[in-house]
A protein has these predicted regions:
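Structural motif
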Residues: 5-10, 44-47, 70-72, 103-107, ...
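Conserved beta-strand termini and adjacent loop/short-helix elements that scaffold enzyme active sites
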Residues: 29-31, 92, 127-129
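Glycine-rich beta-alpha junction loops
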Residues: 72-74, 96, 131, 178-182
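NAD(P)+-binding Rossmann beta1-loop-alpha1 motif at the extreme N-terminus of oxidoreductases
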Residues: 1-36, 158
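Rossmann-like NAD(P)(H) cofactor-binding subdomain of soluble oxidoreductases
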Residues: 32-98
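Interdomain hinge/lid region at the active-site interface
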Residues: 154-221
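Internal alpha-helical scaffold of NAD(P)-dependent oxidoreductase catalytic cores
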Residues: 15, 21, 82-85, 97-175
Length: 221
């Protein structure tokens, strides 16, 4: 299957890489007008970028074309404009290395994503919309801790190389999941870990956001 990738979120690019390992042809899409050459479109964008991405490609998709987005913060409803144009729309957000939160509209798309996940050795999990934000906050916190642990273990020579699975540290989604971290009573830990990860991984936007949130004059909710 020929898959076009629009965007550069880490979650999306890691998902695309796994599809490529499974034998699919992956190509970065520079011009949406070229979409007719592809069987599927992967929107590798964060939740805050999703509406713009849908607008970018809407005029160029075709009926029965598979469209997948990979942000855990948004369900398949975010692709409604493409669904009305006849696309097979799917939300499929990787949660770690083995599972994937999916959201579909019918049995056809459920079967499509089920087959794709089988090919890339991932297990589908139907995640209720009302649980997305909380689950995202917990997962992003865990992945940030994992990144810190891996770097520390490498520096201490506990491990010889950085693990092959790079965590999906997408700044926009990490920041947008923060309200759930506040509700869960983990706001301070979330901010502290985000600041350290931003500094360690040289993700300036994430580091500066965390520093501002830590400032005593800020409303940290």
């Amino acid at each position: 299957m020929r898959v076009a990738v629009w965007g550069n979120s880490r979650a999306g690019l890691n998902f695309a890489r796994r599809l490529e390992w499974a034998g699919h042809t992956i190509e970065s899409l520079e011009d949406p007008s070229e979409l007719d050459r592809f069987d599927a479109l992967l929107l590798a964008v964060t939740a805050r970028e999703l509406e713009g991405a849908v607008g970018d490609v809407a005029k160029h998709v075709r009926p029965r074309q598979i469209v997948i987005h990979t942000s855990l913060l948004a369900g398949v409803e975010a692709l409604d404009e493409l669904e009305t144009r006849g696309c097979l729309t799917i939300a499929a957000a990787p949660m770690g290395w083995e599972s994937c939160a999916i959201s579909t509209l019918d049995e056809v798309t459920d079967t499509v994503i089920g087959l794709l996940l089988t090919e890339i050795h991932m297990t589908p999990e139907h995640l209720p919309e009302e649980q997305r934000l909380e689950r995202a906050a917990r997962m992003y916190y865990a992945e940030m801790l994992w990144a810190l642990h891996s770097r520390a273990a490498l520096a201490a020579k506990i491990i010889d190389d950085f693990p092959s699975h790079v965590p999906d540290l997408d700044t926009g989604d990490i920041i947008d999941a923060y309200p759930a971290a506040v509700e869960l009573g983990m706001a301070r830990n979330y901010r502290d870990v985000a600041r350290m990860v931003g500094e360690q991984e040289r993700i300036e936007e994430l580091e500066l956001w965390a520093v501002r949130k830590e400032a005593p004059w800020q409303n940290n909710s």
